[in-house]
Amino acid sequence: CGSSKNLRFLVGFGAKPQRNFEDKKMENLPIVHVVNGRQKKLLQGHPWVYGNEIERVEGEIEDGGLVTVVDFRGRYMGTGFYNSKSLITVRLLTHRQEEITDELIASRVKAACDYRRFVMNRPGTDSCRLIYGEADRLPGVIADRFGGVIVLQVLALGMERFTQTIADALLACEKPDCLLLQNDDAIRRKEGMECFTRVLYGTLPEENIIHENGVKLAVDVLGGQKTGYFLDQKDNHLFVRQFCKDARVLDCFSYIGAFALNAAAAGAKEVTAVDISEAAVQLIEKNAALNGADITAVCANCFDFLRAQVKAGEKYDVVVLDPPAFTKAHANMASACRGYKEIALSAMRLLPAGGVLATHSCSYHMPEEVFVNTVLSAAQDLHRQVRVITLRRQDIDHPVLAGYPESHYL
């Protein structure tokens, strides 16, 4: 970080905000008082206030409306949107006393796009996450670029009013061929919002082919998971690729085959990709054809497939485990650990000495230390000595906001 330009992006707006603790509330806004002891996380930059953290409310509040948040002494903590229907009752837009305007929102969209333009200038890659919600100070907003198509999601009630502002700013900054508003996520229902999908600009192509690390990928932005594809693993796909030359590779929970395709691009001698979804397997086969790759795509439950491969005495040089989140709540962590350990046990049984296991968890509720210890306990049960080559995270277009640990999940 030798230059000021680099330093700006490294610390960004994660730097500790300046605060004025005088008894000033934004004029005419209702006031939310948080209970004593809960102000610490807000002082550290956390952007959420849960319902059980609210002591009392002053003034009439409408869901989706702006509120001022103060601590138990009445000191200013931030300004955000209120939603009584959401577990996250207040989503803070700022920890400073500044007016929330269309211009402010547009400037944050531009800053988010500028950051990605700076860090994602990678040959052979034309897709990335442009807006990552709270980490870009745009709570509940997701925008992913898939080649010429941008997919936008607005998942927080208070941000709904800024949809057109966000869309216009994305069009101005990125100049895509198509902008799709994909507001059909279940999170919107939990927020009390309507679910729908609409093209805001341009024409959605019948087939959308993106490029990642020089690999071609057909992405289904309408029927696929989330916005169509998981962009957080781009750098990890490339990292795993280096172990795959002349290797026999098994990619479990493959979705559309990204790890498998990177293995094939590395010169793997045999690649098998497994997913439980028939639609995903069809995309794996399509993507293999697009890249001229020889990949065996299997539609199966990965737990069952792994057990069957162990029983059959199969061996692989590289096994990739990239399952969906096994837990979305801390209360389910024990069950999640059992799931991660089971697939790790099977994978290790398939690996010879010197084999490589790339295993992942994509849940904030699974702490890194717990996940690593779960995998290592599988090795201990098998009396296998393992080396941890690296601990990796989501790609750099999914930045982690200081004070907001939920933004680190992979």
Predicted regions, residues:
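Conserved SAM-binding motif I beta-strand of class I
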Residues: E270-D275
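Mobile active-site "lid"/loop adjacent to the S-adenosyl-L-methionine
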Residues: Y316-S346
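Conserved SAM-binding loop of SAM-dependent methyltransferases across substrates and taxa
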Residues: I256-A268
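S-adenosyl-L-methionine
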Residues: Q282-K315
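C-terminal catalytic and target-recognition region of SAM-dependent MTase-like enzymes
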Residues: V356-L410
